[in-house]
Every structure is written in structure tokens, then in C-alpha cells.
Amino acid sequence: MDFAPELITIGQKAKDAARKLAYAGTAAKNKALLAMAEALLNHEQKILEANRKDVEAAIQKGTKKSLVNRLALTSEGIRQMSDALKEVVNLGDPVGEGEFWTRPNGLRIQRTRVPLGVVAMIYEARPNVTVDAAALCLKSGNAVILRGGSEAIESNKILSKVIAGAAESQGMPTACIQLLENTNRQWVQQLMKMNGYVDVIIPRGGAGLIETVVKEATVPVIETGTGVCHAYVDGEADLAKGVSIVFNAKTQKPGVCNALEAVLVNEAVAQEFLPLLGEKFRDYGVEIRGCEKTCAILPYAAKATEEDWGTEYLDLIISAKVVQGVDEAMDHIYQYGTKHSETIITENYTTAQRFLNEVDAAAVYVNASTRFTDGGRFGFGAEIGISTQKLHARGPMGLQALTTMKYMVYGEDHIVT
């Protein structure tokens, strides 16, 4: 494939920056991160002004309200981004971690963590991802090429300019943080095939974006999957817990990948549980799309279509199905789930253990909200995404997931015979 000359320049600059950043010390990287945090606050008005342009353009295009909400920044949001950078400073640096052993022949082997190299982030209308990705890549010694959604281009331009300038002012390599300002989709298609320049691509966004990257990229991809997350309310569930957990998982922040999209209810408790949950959802403005049995119990529920069962709504909508038991619930999750986060509400230990062991997902819960699938809530610190694949990384991906292993071998005239 012929690459745009400008894209080759960006790729080469990233490679050069990654080479230098790989051996940058922890103190130097932390100093740069603190400067980035301060710079965001110092440029708050410019950032808000640029973001306002993006939001106004999105509204004029008739963009969904939920997407506009994800796009919009506030003064508080900028302070939160600044605080997030400071939190990354407090995280341990994975680069250089490892172990050392000596073989019987005296050969000494050291396995140590090293950066991946050049990370390309392809994401949608969340300006905060620009800052989060840049911070995590810098702390883990990686150069990053950022390609955000066209809806957030003005926000991403100013954010990347501010943080990249701050990092470089503290001695970080020039071009360690770069943004693809050209919103032409051909550039994205080329970026996905830049083997030799880019070491890994991490897509972060909706199903369409992720599927496109996985399908078209020749560069290795870490798939941060969509979240069609389920809650199964068992026949031996504490129904008050069930209402609390399901309501939280759906409404606390509906536009994120670990939000609940479907609730499966054991037929033994459906007549009692669904009205309790349904009234609370209706008061909050959550639309319920249910199976025939659900609609018979909740007359205000809309009838679910086949498409609904596999849809990541990212909105105040939830699908609901009455099932015979845990086996049918797990079969449904197997068919429609995306291997992200699944939860069971039950007081039966044996049923809970079956669900934990038999459901294939990055995170499986008992009596807890799926909203806990998060690097910070798991104690990993900030995350670059939540991986639903099994190779290299799975679940919330923190700093360690942005490194790989290198073997350093020490000998004294050791030769193979």
C-alpha cells in the first residue's frame, strides 16, 4: 500500500521518539506528566472554546444527545483530566520490572518489562481519551499516535498541542505524542497497515469502529470490545439487591462499555421482581424492551426485537428477558454477550460458582454491578481500555498491558555444544 507522505513522516517521528522514550527514567516521565497536568489547567479557556465548536457542530448535524454529552467538556472535566494525569504519576512504572535467575551452566537470565514501541489509538468522540492515552503511553515508555473521532477534532487539536508541548518542555522526545489532524478516513485505513512504523493499534469506541479495525488492520490489534453486559437475577436472589445492582449498572453512567444492557430474570421471581425494577426504571426514564413474558408483566415495556438482544445501547434503554434458570441465562449470554462483563444476583453459592466458572467474559461478578470493570476500581490505576480478547491483555488495561517482555542474558564465554 502507498502511504501518504505526511503519514510516513508521522510514523517515522513516532519510531524515533519511541526509541528515546524507551530508556527515559521514571522521574523524568513523572515530571513531564505533572507539567502536562498543569498545562491543561493553564489552557482551560482555550480548551473549552475549541470544545464548544465541536459541540455546536455536532448539534447542527443532528448528532444523538448521548454522543453530544460524551463529546462535551466542562471546567470540572478539565480538572478531572488534570487530576488523572497526577494519578498516573503515582502509579508504579512497569518498565524495568522483572526477574533474574541463573541456569546450572552459569548462564544468567533476566526477564524485564519494556515498552511496546509505537501505539496507535483510534477512538471516537471522547476528548478525555486523548489525554488518558497520551499519559499512559508516556509513563510506559511508548510513543503514541492519536486518531480521535472527527466530531472532536477541534478539542483533540488543542488538547494534544497543550500536553505534547508540556511533555517536550520537560525533555521528552519531540513527537512522542502526535495527533492525526487529517480526518480523511483513508489516513485511518493507511495507519492500520503501517507495519514497521506502528507496533500495536488499540481501538476504543463502538462496535462498528472496533470491527472495522479488527477486520482491516495488518498491524497487531488489542481489541477493546463493546459491552453487551448482562445481569442474571436468579430464583434465589435477594430481590432488593437485584433492583439496586441492576439499576446502578444501567443508570449510573449509561454511555460506557461496562454499563448494563440486558437483564435476565428467573421465571420463579419474575412476577415479583420485574414490577419493582420496572417502576424504578420508568421513574428514571429508562425504556424497557422485553420478551413476551416481560411485556405481559410490564404492559409499558416495548416488545424486543432479535436485534435488541445483541445491541450495546449506551443509552437509557435496557432489554429484559424471563428465563427458566441459570442454564438458559448462560446460553443467552453465550449467544449475545461480547465477553466483557456479566453479573449474577443470587444467594446460592453453587449457582454463583457455576456462573463464575462457565460464563466466558473478561469480568464476571456475583452480587455486584458491572460498572466496577475499570482500572481504577480494580486497583490498577488509570486504564487505556478494557480488552475482551484473550491474547496479550484481558480486562482493564493499565500500564503493564502497554509493555512486553525482553530477555537479557549474561554469559562468560558460554557457547552451545
Curated annotation (Swiss-Prot):
Belongs to the gamma-glutamyl phosphate reductase family. PANTHER family: DELTA-1-PYRROLINE-5-CARBOXYLATE SYNTHASE, GLUTAMATE SEMIALDEHYDE DEHYDROGENASE. Keywords: Amino-acid biosynthesis, Cytoplasm, NADP, Oxidoreductase, Proline biosynthesis. GO terms for cellular component: cytoplasm. Its main location: cytoplasm. It catalyses: L-glutamate 5-semialdehyde + phosphate + NADP(+) = L-glutamyl 5-phosphate + NADPH + H(+). It is found in: Cytoplasm. Catalyzes the NADPH-dependent reduction of L-glutamate 5-phosphate into L-glutamate 5-semialdehyde and phosphate. The product spontaneously undergoes cyclization to form 1-pyrroline-5-carboxylate. This is Gamma-glutamyl phosphate reductase. It is an enzyme of class 1 (oxidoreductase). GO terms for molecular function: glutamate-5-semialdehyde dehydrogenase activity; NADP binding. Pathway: Amino-acid biosynthesis; L-proline biosynthesis; L-glutamate 5-semialdehyde from L-glutamate: step 2/2. It holds the Pfam family Aldedh. InterPro entries: Ald_DH/histidinol_DH, Ald_DH_C, Ald_DH_N, Aldehyde_DH_dom, G-glutamylP_reductase_CS, Glu-5-SA_DH, GPR_dom. GO terms for biological process: L-proline biosynthetic process. Transmembrane segments: none annotated. Its EC number is 1.2.1.41.
